């Protein structure tokens, strides 16, 4: 195999199915942008606590990796505090990324005043979305357990859970999310959110 002009320093980054190689590359690129991260590990923190599990609960509160646009969805985060003194005013946050690394939403419990004085032992944080606006695609959830001001990281789990959003009856075919809007023409509703899931 001969190198093409301008590619004499090319390096083979991976072998396998195209999707898998691209996923691995995009994950490495995204991680390398985070401050204090080595660009390889998917978890880091001071070890005072750990996120045990990330789940998506679909209709019926059942764990799943496949949901539909418009479904009621709960993002569940199980944690364990390892420090015997507990964590003072901790904050859980999570990021929802598209497969190419684009951040769709960053949610932080502090913004909704869900910050306990002290956190000990094991427990669960649930974040429920009544009508999931995401359109068809593959998404990753990352989670972090930090101090109240997000200056100290106890555990950060990057891309801890991947899930698929499957098609539903919505009228947007482009972009990342459904607006669940309705069209009116001359004062009459002609199509829209009423006919979605």
List the predicted regions and their residue ranges:
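Localized sequence-composition bias
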Residues: 1-197
């Amino acid at each position: 195999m001969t190198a093409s002009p301008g590619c004499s320093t090319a390096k083979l980054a991976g072998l396998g199915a195209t999707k898998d190689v691209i996923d691995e590359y995009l994950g490495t690129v995204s991680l390398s942008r985070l401050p204090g991260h080595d660009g390889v590990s998917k978890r880091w923190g001071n070890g005072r606590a750990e996120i045990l599990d990330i789940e998506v609960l679909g209709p019926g509160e059942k764990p799943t990796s496949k949901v539909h646009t418009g479904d009621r969805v709960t993002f569940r985060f199980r944690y364990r505090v390892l420090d015997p003194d507990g964590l003072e005013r901790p904050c859980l946050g999570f990021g929802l990324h598209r497969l190419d690394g684009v951040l769709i939403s960053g949610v932080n419990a502090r913004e909704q005043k869900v910050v306990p004085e002290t956190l000990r032992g094991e427990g669960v944080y649930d974040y429920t979305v009544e009508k999931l606006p995401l359109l068809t695609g593959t998404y990753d959830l990352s989670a972090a357990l930090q101090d109240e001001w997000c200056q100290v990281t106890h555990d950060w789990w990057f891309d801890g859970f991947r899930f698929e959003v499957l098609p539903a009856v919505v009228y947007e075919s482009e972009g990342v999310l459904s607006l669940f809007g309705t069209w009116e023409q001359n004062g009459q509703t002609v199509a829209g959110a009423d006919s979605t899931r």
